[in-house]
């Protein structure tokens, strides 16, 4: 019984089958040849499996197509996040028609840039700002982070490339003694 409506097991089964067929079609659809920007991330969600709740890695790929429209290219589920799974995902995207990706924004998973490069060798990879900021918070004492984050923000909120480069140089110069921080940025 759902919302005071009784449904037979057969009806629920048929509805589930219909939805699953649409999901499979969507997940295997042909994609555009080029996505100038692609954002990737993996998050963990609780899912029901064998009558118990467990955490699974949910891989999400969001592309910005040549018309500037955002498009979810796919969603995959696995037990954990790994560079090898990301490699499989990029190979699947290639088989679905994606020939070129200019930039990928990603987290700092070890081996991820190499996994992307193995499928799309010309693609530029960059850690996303959110993950860089989280890493700054995780490696520095709280009393230092406010000023550092404020200085770092000047880089990625610059109005143009020239100003961003200048702010980056200022940041590196100011914090060059903090090797741990510089390595993360």
What are these regions (language model features)?
Residues 2-11, 17-106, 110, 114, ...:
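RNase H-like nuclease fold core
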Residues 16, 76-77, 158, 165:
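Alpha-helical interaction segments
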Residues 117-185:
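Extended amphipathic alpha-helical interaction segments
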């Amino acid at each position: 019984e759902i919302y005071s409506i009784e449904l037979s097991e057969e009806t629920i089964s048929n509805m589930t089958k219909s939805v699953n067929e649409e999901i499979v079609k969507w997940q295997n659809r042909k994609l555009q040849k080029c996505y100038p920007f692609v954002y990737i991330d993996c998050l963990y969600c609780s899912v029901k499996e064998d009558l118990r709740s467990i955490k699974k890695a949910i891989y999400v790929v969001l592309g910005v197509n040549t018309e500037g429209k955002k498009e979810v290219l796919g969603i995959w589920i696995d037990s954990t996040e790994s560079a090898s799974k990301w490699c499989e995902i990029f190979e699947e995207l290639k088989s679905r028609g994606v020939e070129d990706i200019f930039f990928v924004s990603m987290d700092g998973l070890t081996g991820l840039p190499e996994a992307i490069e193995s499928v799309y060798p010309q693609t530029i990879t960059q850690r996303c700002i959110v993950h860089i900021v989280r890493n700054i918070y995780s490696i520095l004492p709280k009393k230092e982070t406010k000023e550092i984050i404020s200085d770092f923000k000047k880089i990625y909120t610059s109005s143009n490339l020239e100003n961003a480069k200048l702010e980056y140089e200022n940041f590196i110069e100011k914090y060059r003694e903090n090797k741990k921080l510089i390595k993360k940025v």
